Amino acid sequence: MPHSSSNSVSLLVALLTLLGAAAFPSLAAASPDSVRAVAGVRHVDVALMAPQAQKTKSKSATKKKASQATSAKKKAETSKKATPATKKPVRPRPEWPVKGPTPLPGSLLPHKRIVAYYGNPLSKRMGVLGEYPPDEMLRRLDREVAAWSKADTLTPVIPALHLIVTVAQGSAGRDGKWRTRMSDSLIERVYGWAQRRNALLFLDVQVGKSTLQAEIPPLAKFLARPNVHLGIDPEFSMKSGHAPGKRIGSYDARDVNWTVDYLAELVDKNKIPPKVLVIHRFTRPMLTNSKNIRLDPRVQIVIDMDGWGSARLKQDSYEAYVVSEPVQFTGFKLFYKNDIRKKGWRLMRPADVLALDPRPVYIQYQ
């Protein structure tokens, strides 16, 4: 971890104490490690995985990549840079549900709930999707779907696999974009797994120093399928010029609006039901000018609270970074390992998440 990390975290704790003490007690009282859980990088995403076509590389090259991955993981511990602390009045809580376009026929939300397994089969460290053999992974997903169906009998549950298809890297690569694209064959393989459960497939994009405009169009042939949807991760959109993992990245409303327009055109062109767009978020600067995001009935937007930590910290982060800046629908991420990494922490149960207001309609497990 860089030496500046502890200073950054201390500044962040002070900032949160000033800004959030009244509305979000656990954010204000959090220890540096707990603050990092929500304001820091998620650790496991920057995996420096070689593309599937490059499996023939020498063992020495593989070891070098592993060493780089360890270095990138350590860099990912750094918290976001604190801004000058200015005490602001507590804003009134926005009204939910958001007033938006009437759902079109075939829309999934808000009358269904999506329960997804996140990750990449080339790495056990990036999430549960790649941690287990396919059959076992799908059986575990079945159990979660059953648990959510039991917890909320009025909302049908749809299983999903959330595959990271563009992976941020800790090195520039040949084209200097600091990201690796997964092969079509890998995407087809995971799509096949989803088909075995009549599940959705989400394609998740970490652009590194590339752009959404460059990374999403190559996925068009998959997104043209009615059961394939999209996720975009601001954490690894490095407009600052830093390497992924050194700073938390960001998207602006303009980036989201471009993505919505692109997906809407695909819906019209292919005469398919509306798409779901998942946007990860666990700090305020990750998504700027959210009030300027345009809603379109052909694309349903989910802001997914993506921080790990204690249940109280996650609840307050949901309120601070998702509920307080309404876009359209909400999601909530649960980490099998990071959410229980400290004594006294426990994995939130479906009933715990359903107690949130508004109730998340997209649930992701990593």
Language-model segment annotations:
Residues 13-23:
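Bacterial N-terminal signal peptides
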